[in-house]
């Protein structure tokens, strides 16, 4: 009996030791997992040099906002077609410690001397090209203001240290890729109209892969900004150079415009979709409202029950896009000038009514308004080891903006005034019809489709994403979200899936590579256009680590995820 008890006791001791050992390893596993999480960070952007600069900032202890500022300044040098000092954009920031998400509107504003009919002749006809390639095509730039605000408010680095790599890149030059060389040559005529742009961005025999692009005046401007701060761009020597150039060449952008520029801190537009929360930009971006509206409509059906990109799946997408873009045109504009019914447009109840109409195959009547912006925009996504996240989209509008560089600055200026309705009820430069909500007014912000997005799961960033692509930004980002949330694709798998785009007007179905029979079944007498759609740069947090990916629809992009 005693021996039996001793044996049981020994067995208990063995089990106790095993349990303790298991507990010990579990503690180690949890501890090790926390270390992995604490050392994880990622950057995805359009240019490999900018991504590398961002990764270095994160490696050396900077946070996501520090890296974002460094990446944005770098893209102004190595991606001159869209990265910029002379443009504007939107930045979405998630602060992990505060569990707070804020957005910065640093988009361009209309100059004080702007007026509704400024791109019309005396007879009321639109003067072709005036809103795109002329001295009056530029809005007041907001990029420098936005980057300084983000750095000063949320960053940890001295901004000089974040700008210095870009100064060196501009002064010493960087190697052009084949794509960049061809793109510069393609826009030679645009640059030829401006003395400094012609000197920097053209060659007698054109650029070739491997050529070095040097931008000394831009380096000098960046150096002054690093030394003197934001005031250098808005009231210092650089501001005077910009204002004097415009005033001396028949422009309307003035020193007063620069001096009075103010960014806006906005509450993001957020909504729930299945088990996730999606946050994006509020107006003057149309992206947040349109995305939430479409997702609300689609939430009424189990998309995962369809085969991906099947006829049934694409039909419901096209219908939801149709309604959202109709509302975008009719109801969205700068909220400082126009009463935007945001709560209505993003409500589940409103989406349910639309879905019921779609079920009855009732499509919205072809309205008389819509807006299209250029495809030349750029996006980057960043996550740091503390869980802070940045999703940023900024632009010059069309490629290289207006093609105008104020003498001595090296700064390409935007042509963002074309994003306004040059004449309500009349087609703009892209063949689309403008709305009263987006008419030109002094100090007003033009409507945009830029849609920086952060998707949350359990109150933590799950997907950080965004894209260039003009009015196709919204639908490109939408399909990235659906691919990942509904179909559980990886970022790489998602990028390989063909995309569609439909925006109510014009009545054209834009599509990538699909089978002919499928496209014909979706046609319904619409015009068809086969083209690349979007250029996604995303970061995805997975159970087993991080995935970062830059869309291969355009070369030169790079995504880096460090998961130690």
Task: List PLM regions with ranges.
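Noncatalytic scaffold domains of N-terminal-nucleophile
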Residues: 36-52, 56, 62-229, 233-235, ...
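Bacterial N-terminal signal peptides that target proteins for export
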Residues: 4-23
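Extended C-terminal subregions enriched in glycine
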Residues: 444, 477, 486-531
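Short beta-strand scaffold segments in enzyme catalytic cores
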Residues: 84, 88-95, 378-383, 452-454, ...
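Bacterial N-terminal signal peptides
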Residues: 22-33
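Active-site rim segments in enzyme catalytic domains, especially the processed small/beta chain
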Residues: 77-94, 98-103, 252-254, 389-457, ...
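Internal maturation/activation junctions in enzymes
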Residues: 301-395, 409, 424-425
